[in-house]
Structures are given as C-alpha cells and as structure tokens.
Amino acid sequence: MQTLADLLNTIPAIDPAAMSRAQRHIDGLLKPVGSLGRLEALAIQLAGMPGLNGIPHVGKKAVLVMCADHGVWEEGVAISPKEVTAIQAENMTRGTTGVCVLAAQAGANVYVIDVGIDTAEPIPGLINMRVARGSGNIASAPAMSRHQAEKLLLDVICYTRELAKNGVTLFGVGELGMANTTPAAAIVSTITGRAPEEVVGIGANLPTDKLANKIDVVRRAITLNQPNPQDGVDVLAKVGGFDLVGMAGVMLGAASCGLPVLLDGFLSYAAALAACQMSPAIKPYLIPSHLSAEKGARIALSHLGLEPYLNMEMRLGEGSGAALAMPIIEAACAIYNNMGELAASNIVLPGNTTSDLNS
C-alpha cells in the first residue's frame, strides 16, 4: 500500500518543452502577440501539465466540497449555529446551494464529502470519509492527531486520483464548516509569519465587536500548539481542520496526476499553503479562481505567488469561486485549439516572425 510520502514523490514536474511549444503555437495565432493577456499564459501553463499531454483541454469537471465541523466554534468565533454545517451539506445533495448552481452552470459535478460533520449518523447522499465528529478545539488542544491528518490526506488523494482515472481533468476545491475561517487564519498566520490581526477577518458576517476575540483565539491556538511552519502536515493537524486537510488532499491528488486544480477562496489558500509545504512541486498546478473578500486573502496569495483571475468580492466558500472560474479554463483551451494561424492567412504582424510561426 502506498504511503503519503510515496504519493508525494509521484508528483510530476511541469514540462518546459511542452510550454515552449505552446508559446510558439499561441504566438502564431490570428492576433497580435500577447493580446489575449493572461488567457495566453493560462493556456501555456495548462500545456505544461503532463496529465493533459501537451494539449490544453477540459474533459470532465469536478468540484470536491469538504464538509466538517470545528471544535473552535465553542469559542464564539462564529455567529452561525454549528448545525448549519449539516443542514447545508444536506442542501448540497439537493443541488440548491451556491456552489451547486454555479457548478451546474459550468457543467461540473459536485462531490459533497463528509470528512468531519458533527452528527450522530452519516448524512444520506454524502460521500463518507468522516474522521471524527468535528475537530478538536484548537484554542485548547490540537485539531487532530498527525495520524488522522495523514490518513485523511491519503484517502482524499486516492479518491481524487480515482476520479482522474474516470475522466476528470479539471478539479475545483471547496469547503463547508461553521467557524472554519478561524483555523484557516491560524494556518495562514503560521506559514506566512504574519500576525493574527493581519489575517483574521469576519468570516460569515461575524460582528466587528467579536473580531478581537477571534484574533485572540487564533493567537492562543498558535501559542499553545506550536505548529512547525515548515511542516504542512503538522500545521494542519495542530491548528487546521478536517475540511482544510481534505482540500489539501485534492490539490496533492490532482497534481500527482499532472492535472490542474482551481482554488476557491481564503480557506483554499490556507490549505494550499500547507500543501505546498508538503510538496512545492504542486504549485504550478494551482490556479487561483478569485480574490476572496476575507481579510488575509492577499497575504496568503502573495505568499503562494498567485494572482487570481476574478475579483467578485465573494466570500461564500463552498467552491463557488472555483466553479465560477471553470469557463475561464475552457476559454484558454478554446483559443489554443480553435483559433486560426497567421501563417495560413498570410498576415505578418510585428513580434510574429516567420521563424516563430514555422518552429
């Protein structure tokens, strides 16, 4: 049986030769060089992913939503009742939540995965990977054991790889869990080295008079648990949550297949920071969908070296931003595969040389 270390070692490097070929191809299309901006860069990035075999394309699309409760909810860091996690997860099975509507619009399937919802019985219609009924309260204990974190990572990686075997070529990550912006902020603070007050935001409309308590909870969690910022698993286990671990697993699993994964908002940035500590090789496979309105978003993205494609002032989570950005990926593939070539039209533009076009 493969271990987590075994799977991390399978993550392939991006193919620079394929990216160079894609650059020459795109420069020879019916347009001035660089005139489609970041869409061109995205197509070239996709061409370098081994799982796409040098040709940017989209097969099946999937948004994986990791659902879990958090013991830190007891600290008064969220105004929504904890039961909302289970209620919204059930609503996802009916296709009525934000991510479900946006994913349907994008032609993507939504996989709702219970990795730690606090209910007595599993919720019908959810994929059951539950580790426990919620994580530990990070203000007074670790979120989980390292063994639990590693096992969940491995389970989600394997599940993601199985979806890839069944034709999924574009993944999106999402989450659901009351109070989960608190552990996310703790992860971002730990790995970036920024102070809690710089990264803690209001989450799901936390009143501003409760923000000081949330900042204090994050500070206490880091001080108590002493997560090692160089060890992504340690950070997730000590100050994270099962939903954050699950998202990191999707990223690692997609990258191990040489396939792209769309990030969502602040929670996914935190998971990505931890995943990149485990394997920096995954970074070229991460595509930032949108700029979360949550405080600390820019800090996390800057540390990742990523610039989001959309700025919609969204902070819903669920994978809503990932679903919304899927047509951008398809657009990048479309220009690469369907545009005509300058050479075939006898057009010569500055910056488009004959040697470029015929290489």
UniProtKB/Swiss-Prot annotation:
SUPFAM superfamilies: Nicotinate mononucleotide:5,6-dimethylbenzimidazole phosphoribosyltransferase (CobT) (SSF52733). Its EC number is 2.4.2.21. It is an enzyme of class 2 (transferase). The keyword Transmembrane helix does not apply. Pfam families: DBI_PRT (PF02277). The keyword Glycosyltransferase applies. The active site is at E318 (proton acceptor). Keywords: Cobalamin biosynthesis, Glycosyltransferase, Transferase. Signal peptide: none annotated. GO terms for biological process: cobalamin biosynthetic process. GO terms for molecular function: nicotinate-nucleotide-dimethylbenzimidazole phosphoribosyltransferase activity. CDD domains: DMB-PRT_CobT. It catalyses: 5,6-dimethylbenzimidazole + nicotinate beta-D-ribonucleotide = alpha-ribazole 5'-phosphate + nicotinate + H(+). Pathway: Nucleoside biosynthesis; alpha-ribazole biosynthesis; alpha-ribazole from 5,6-dimethylbenzimidazole: step 1/2. Gene3D superfamilies: 1.10.1610.10, 3.40.50.10210. NCBIfam families: cobT_DBIPRT, PRK00105.1. Catalyzes the synthesis of alpha-ribazole-5'-phosphate from nicotinate mononucleotide (NAMN) and 5,6-dimethylbenzimidazole (DMB). Belongs to the CobT family. Homodimer. This is Nicotinate-nucleotide--dimethylbenzimidazole phosphoribosyltransferase. It comes from Escherichia coli O139:H28 (strain E24377A / ETEC).
